[in-house]
Amino acid sequence: MLDNVLKIATRQSPLALWQAHYVKDALMATHPGLTVELVPMVTRGDVILDTPLAKVGGKGLFVKELEIALLEKRADIAVHSMKDVPVAFPDGLGLVTICEREDPRDAFVSNQYHSLDDLPAGSIVGTSSLRRQCQLAERRPDLIIRSLRGNVGTRLGKLDNGDYDAIILAVAGLKRLGLASRIRTALPPEVSLPAVGQGAIGIECRLDDARTHALLAPLNHPQTALRVTAERAMNTRLEGGCQVPIGSYAEIFNGEIWLRALVGAPDGSVMVRGERRGSPEQAEQMGISLAEELLENGARAILTAVYNGEAPA
């Protein structure tokens, strides 16, 4: 990095570019005189749109090319949606900053119906997230759930074209793109537990790049970082990936972290839930211990069955 230039690796989707510009603006406001440049790139996750992510390598497909750019020093930082960031990082790279979280809930989007409960039996709902699919199937087994890939605009276009009666998207993405008016209902965590890190923006960089770390430090949001730390610790212990429906959501009330999590069979037939409360200093340990509880209460059997291509008992 030149003394006054910082380069951001980002995907080219509208939402990814919004996030990159958000970080760029925050950096320039915090460090007058700093020049920030975007390095847009296409990832495999952006190209492979005809196959569920779970079958082609998971959400890590969205970050690999960005990480290569960091390692080759073509960029100084990479900006990610935290829900797309795998639990492990390549040697020499790490997550150094987590920005303040936007609304982490899932959004019910429909042109005809006001809520999930309003959908008639047999309605077609679009989502490619196994986490969303399993919770929908558990709550409304009478619905037809179909895969839906592509960026936010593409997904809304398919809804508007009549391919689906409703679709499920992230509230955060719709709000960031100025599309909050498309949200019919924001689904509470009790109905659709969010993905790990959903709504948060993470910044990855080289671990030995002290200057960049110092530039990024003011952008870190401690409460969001604690919440996401608890969620990711749980997911790391479960060795969770796109192939398994895993939800995890941490909130902070009165100085205490409340962490909820679930592991489910893709068809919603089996669901294991748990929760923990504790001090912020225990965020990582809470995530690990909650994962252990879920594993003992049936999640291990679900994970084993799904990874072996079997139906959970």
UniProtKB/Swiss-Prot annotation:
Name of the gene encoding the protein in the UniProt record: hemC
EC number: 2.5.1.61
Similarity comment: family membership: Belongs to the HMBS family.
GO cellular component term, pick one: cytoplasm
Listed GO biological process terms: protoporphyrinogen IX biosynthetic process
Note: The porphobilinogen subunits are added to the dipyrromethane group.
Protein role: Tetrapolymerization of the monopyrrole PBG into the hydroxymethylbilane pre-uroporphyrinogen in several discrete steps.
Entry protein name: Porphobilinogen deaminase
PANTHER family named in the record: PORPHOBILINOGEN DEAMINASE (PTHR11557:SF0)
Residues carrying S-(dipyrrolylmethanemethyl)cysteine: 242
Subunit structure: Monomer.
HAMAP family reported for this sequence: Porphobil_deam
Catalysed reactions listed for this entry: 4 porphobilinogen + H2O = hydroxymethylbilane + 4 NH4(+)
Domain of life: Bacteria
InterPro entries assigned: HemC (IPR000860), Porphobilin_deaminase_cofac_BS (IPR022419), Porphobilin_deaminase_N (IPR022417), Porphobilinogen_deaminase_C (IPR022418), Porphobilinogen_deaminase_C_sf (IPR036803)
Coiled coil: none
Pathway connected to this protein: Porphyrin-containing compound metabolism; protoporphyrin-IX biosynthesis; coproporphyrinogen-III from 5-aminolevulinate: step 2/4
